[in-house]
Curated annotation (Swiss-Prot):
The gene is PSMB4. It is found in: Cytoplasm; Nucleus. It holds the Pfam family Proteasome. The keyword Signal does not apply. GO terms for cellular component: cytoplasm; nucleus; proteasome core complex; proteasome core complex, beta-subunit complex. It comes from the Eukaryota. This is Proteasome subunit beta type-4. Its main location: cytoplasm. It comes from Sus scrofa (Pig). Non-catalytic component of the 20S core proteasome complex involved in the proteolytic degradation of most intracellular proteins. This complex plays numerous essential roles within the cell by associating with different regulatory particles. Associated with two 19S regulatory particles, forms the 26S proteasome and thus participates in the ATP-dependent degradation of ubiquitinated proteins. Keywords: Acetylation, Cytoplasm, Nucleus, Phosphoprotein, Proteasome. Belongs to the peptidase T1B family.
Length: 154
């Protein structure tokens, strides 16, 4: 038995120590480090939404628009958070409501808030139209989905 182990030790010389992993260098332009996929390193993107919300309703009528959402955040099947808002005022003409993962909604809220601040700093009197916000959101969500790191919101 010892002779088998000794012969193998020469074959595997230079490998990782017991309990360690081989480090595969990333290829130029790769999105994901192959070592993390092959050897079970921590995944740095959301695989399953944790805190989710469900219902958002928008109604258009002759005098304007009404948007409503429930305030429940579910942690799996547990009704965990009972007072979270999933509606955001982007500017004077645009509101955003989101269902799905609450963390992704918070991310979108932060990015859109910064975009609006940057636009207001120009001081030209213009702001983002609802069509411009919609266009940006569709491109941003498609871009993330294309990179296999989707935003889990609708």
């Amino acid at each position: 038995m010892e002779s088998i182990l000794e012969s193998r030790s020469g074959h595997w010389a230079g490998g990782p120590a017991p309990g360690q992993f081989y480090r595969i260098p990333p290829t130029p332009g790769s999105i994901v480090d192959p070592x993390s996929v092959l050897y079970g390193s921590p995944i740095t993107r959301t695989q399953n939404p944790m805190v989710t919300g469900t219902s958002v309703l928008g109604v258009k009528f002759e005098g304007g628009v009404v948007i409503a959402a429930d305030m429940l955040g579910s942690y799996g099947s547990l009704a965990r958070f009972r007072n979270i808002s999933r509606i955001m005022r982007v500017n004077n003409s645009t509101m955003l409501g989101a269902s799905g993962d609450y963390a992704d909604f918070q991310y979108l809220k932060q990015v859109l808030g910064q975009m609006v601040i940057d636009e207001e700093l120009l001081g030209d009197g213009h702001s983002y139209s609802p069509k411009a916000i919609h266009s940006w959101l569709t491109r941003a969500m498609y871009n993330r989905r294309f990179k296999m790191n989707p935003l889990w919101t609708t």
